[in-house]
Structures are given as structure tokens and as C-alpha cells.
A protein has these predicted regions:
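General beta-strand structural signal in soluble alpha/beta enzymes
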Residues: 8-12, 58-59, 92, 159, ...
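Active-site catalytic microenvironments for nucleophilic, acid-base chemistry
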Residues: 49, 100, 104, 257, ...
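A structured beta-alpha segment of the ubiquitous adenosine-cofactor-binding alpha/beta core
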Residues: 78-83
């Protein structure tokens, strides 16, 4: 790695304030390589690459089940019409719906499907000028990264996410993505821990996201799970569980890992 991009501690708050005068802290860790990406443009680019390689995206199409067949799978889908598709591999990267897809895979042991907890995270945007030129992350809170500062490619400053644990029996297809405006006061309190100059009435509701987690409130945070044939014993099947918000950052590494599993089985067979 380029030495200029390595993380380095800022042992005194004065060093951090020289870089970010609005920041209040005791110490900080500088990460020069951290940044932002246009997630929509990234996905559009990846889709174009996939389609150029022969893939097809089928939207508004629900996975309704799969059965093992002749070393591969017959997958059933439902939408305007029902279809059956014969395939060599099923890679379940359905996010919030990954457990539902696994349960609809005939013969897959239910005991191997991990419990899922859903954590809703709110974001509020800032009216006015951005106070920082870098991303700012406070110490993590239970279940999340803490209410951190970020900015989009248009320069809009945002804060979030918080953590709102949803009832464990909430169906993934009945989730509410509205921003709860009454949570704003907690945002003011959290943000003022590292930006005391935040003015009242300067936050506006932005958006929410819901994270599929493999550990619940107060529990030790668990990592992603990539369960392939070596784990569950079924050929041509990979389940990705608990791929929550860091999954976008790790998406290319996850894809490389999944591809290595597919290639390893293909070589053996």
C-alpha cells in the first residue's frame, strides 16, 4: 500500500482540529484512503459488465423455490408468469430475503439457516454548509457504527445511521422505510458529542435503510456468512447471510470469494 494512504493515529486533539477545526475529540485515527462512491453508478456499471458477459437481469420476478436436479438445480420464479429455470448454481445474495430464499430451497436443512435480526437505520441531512472535509466516525455504538458524518458526491452532508431494532417477527416484505422524525433529537445529542456547533432545526429527514444482522441487541457482532457446498454439503449452492451495510464496501471481495468457491467445485467435478 502507498504509505501516504495508511491509517495513522492523531494522538492529540489539536492535530485533529488542525485538519477539521469544527471537530471536538480527545484523539482520532486518520484514514487517508477512506472515501465515498456513487453506489447507483457502481451497480449500473457492474450490471453492464454482467450483461456483456451474457447475464440477464429479471426484475419484478420472485424466487418461489428450487429443487436439486442432476447435479444442479431447477429454480422456480413467479411474476407476471411462472417459470422454471435449470441452472448449475444458485447464489443466494438476497439480503433481507436471504433466509426466505434458503427456506424455499427444497432439502436445505433449516438448522443451518441463521436467525436474522433487522436493524433500521435513519439518516438526517444537514441544511447549510458541510462542517467537515472528511468522513467522521465516532466510536461505534451497540449494533452499528454510531451516528457518523458523511457526504454525497453532490456535497450534501448527512448523518446516520442510528439503530432501531425491529420486532424479530417482522416480515421482510412488510418493512416500513419512512423516516421517524421524532428520532431527530437523539441525532442532535449524538452529533453534538463531536460537533458541538450543530444548530437547532438544521437537520432534515433524509432516508432509512434496514440491515439484516446475524446478532441481536447487546450480543457480540457477527460477521457475514458465505455458506458454500463445503459447509452444507449441497452442490451448486451458496447462501450469503447477514450481508449488511459494509457489504457494499466489501462487494468486490465477496464476489471474488464466491467465484473462488464456484471455480473450486467446477475443477473438482
Amino acid at each position: 500500500m502507498n504509505p501516504a494512504l495508511r491509517q495513522r493515529p492523531l494522538d492529540q486533539s489539536v492535530q485533529a482540529r488542525e485538519m477539521e477545526p469544527e471537530l471536538s475529540c480527545h484523539a482520532a485515527l486518520l484514514s487517508p484512503s477512506s472515501g465515498i462512491v456513487d453506489s447507483h453508478a457502481l451497480m449500473t456499471s457492474l450490471l453492464a459488465d454482467a450483461e456483456a458477459a451474457g447475464a440477464m437481469l429479471a426484475v419484478a420476478t420472485r424466487f418461489s423455490g428450487a429443487v436439486a436436479h442432476d447435479g444442479g438445480w431447477i429454480m422456480r420464479t413467479a411474476g407476471d408468469s411462472e417459470y422454471e429455470l435449470e441452472c448449475g448454481w444458485i447464489i443466494n445474495s438476497a439480503g433481507l430475503f436471504a433466509q426466505s430464499v434458503a427456506r424455499a430451497t427444497t432439502g436445505y436443512p433449516v438448522r443451518l439457516i441463521p436467525q436474522q435480526w433487522l436493524a433500521k437505520g435513519h439518516y438526517f441531512s444537514l441544511t447549510g454548509r458541510s462542517p467537515f472535509s472528511r468522513l467522521v466516525y465516532p466510536l461505534p455504538s451497540d449494533g452499528g457504527l454510531g451516528v457518523h458524518f458523511t457526504v454525497d458526491l453532490g456535497g450534501q452532508a448527512k448523518f446516520g445511521p442510528d439503530v432501531e431494532w425491529l420486532p424479530i417477527d417482522t416480515p421482510a416484505d412488510a418493512l416500513d422505510y419512512t423516516v421517524a422524525e421524532e428520532r431527530a433529537q437523539a441525532f442532535y445529542d449524538e452529533i453534538r458529542r463531536y460537533w458541538p456547533a450543530l444548530l437547532d432545526r438544521s437537520l432534515q429527514p433524509a432516508y432509512t435503510g434496514i440491515r439484516p444482522k446475524l446478532s441481536g441487541p447487546g450480543a457480540h457482532a457477527l460477521d457475514f456468512r458465505i455458506d458454500g457446498p463445503k459447509f452444507h454439503g449441497q452442490s451448486g449452492l451458496i447462501h450469503l447471510f447477514g450481508i449488511e451495510s459494509p457489504g457494499l464496501t466489501a462487494s468486490m471481495a465477496i464476489a471474488t470469494r464466491v467465484a473462488s468457491i464456484v471455480c473450486a467445485q467446477s475443477i473438482r467435478s
